[in-house]
Amino acid sequence: MKKFINQFSASLKNNILVFLAFPFVWTSCARDNPLSSENSNISPNAAARAAVTGTTKANIKLFSFTEVNDTNPLNNLNFTLKNSGKPLVDMVVLFSANINYDAANDKVFVSNNPNVQHLLTNRAKYLKPLQDKGIKVILSILGNHDRSGIANLSTARAKAFAQELKNTCDLYNLDGVFFDDEYSAYQTPPPSGFVTPSNNAAARLAYETKQAMPNKLVTVYVYSRTSSFPTAVDGVNAGSYVDYAIHDYGGSYDLATNYPGLAKSGMVMSSQEFNQGRYATAQALRNIVTKGYGGHMIFAMDPNRSNFTSGQLPALKLIAKELYGDELVYSNTPYSKDW
């Protein structure tokens, strides 16, 4: 995800979501599968993950990170599996919204650039068709060159920001969030209301987010200060509040030590970066299956890019073959960015 974020920043700062105090993005799993930790024997994150299971073709989930500055997320509908008839993609991650600081009101909030906001505002056109096919829609949250970030919020600020994330998910009927600790301008010493950036502070935010919306997905990038949450938060291990940990490109080591209690089903391995031509080998994909891991990620898939036929499409066919034992069907009806 690195290197594709600076372009978000300039427009983001002029498009801060002032409505944050009220709405937010996701209604996915919770609305379709109202599993609650209060009336279920499974943990909140197990409930969220259970809502994903059963709407997809296999236990291995394919995450597609869509660079919405350039790409229409509806392109994820172009790919199905021949035998099952189900979508290749299980989760679409909108890359990316941001975390920013409002100095006038001394609060941290979610900010969206015009591209992200257009998709959210017009969710009926761009997001609902994905969800109608059983694809979950997740909002990425990324640092944006100011004092606030994923990894430096005090407990009070983490609780408040988690509530804002819930509001956003509810407002836009989204299915969860993804935390990426990059591009923040952390300050030393930390200003009032912030703490020294740390994995523990990032874990606190993930924990508070799961507390605020237990039936939504909380996912993290295995990178920077979200790369491991080894210390329990209020006595709770990471596996109880992180649904999926998504490896950096090519990463394939087991994450049990990084996130105590996280099942293999929540580990997303051997990620690919399509824009840079960083593709996974057949063996890497087979290892996901044979070792019992739960996910795989592709970044920057776009049928309108020049390397689609030569690189992206063969990589997608290999995913269908190795992860699902199936054949890819490409509809050959790419969606352009029409906003």
From Swiss-Prot:
The keyword Ligase does not apply. It is found in: Secreted. Monomer. It comes from Elizabethkingia meningoseptica (Chryseobacterium meningosepticum). One of its GO terms (cellular component) is extracellular region. PROSITE patterns: GH18_2. Residues 1-50 form the signal peptide. Keywords: Glycosidase, Hydrolase, Secreted, Signal. This is Endo-beta-N-acetylglucosaminidase F1. Its EC number is 3.2.1.96. SUPFAM superfamilies: (Trans)glycosidases (SSF51445). Endohydrolysis of the di-N-acetylchitobiosyl unit in high-mannose glycopeptides and glycoproteins. Does not hydrolyze complex bi- or triantennary glycans. The presence of a core-bound fucose impedes endo F1 hydrolysis.
